[in-house]
Amino acid sequence: MEGVITADIINSREVSPDIWLNLLKDTLQNAGVEHSSWEVYRGDSIQLITKPINALYLGILLKAVTKQIPNLDIRMAIGIGEITYRSEKVSSSNGPAFINSGVAFDALNKKTLAIKTPWKDFDEVLNI
């Protein structure tokens, strides 16, 4: 099992990427996330692979760090599952963990955090 976080920086165009991107890089590095396990794509979207036990911690950490910058926020989905194809680029990898993260991200609407796992009962408890 793996955890996949798919995230999007809210109001990223209002703040210089030098500020939020460097903060994001430093935060992930300090949290011990290897650079090969995460990627920024489409300018302000992020995807990272982690152990399931670390996924919620990293999600909360990214949220807390992002909220330190005025007018900035982050919306994210955490997917738990297998990774059946691992590419050099995180965004080109695939499997149920990525699918769960993508499905949860697409369903966010006005929410800023959702979790989707193989266990429906678990999802219902976490997604209040």
Give residue ranges: language-model regions.
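Regulatory and interdomain segments flanking nucleotide-handling catalytic cores
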Residues: 1-128
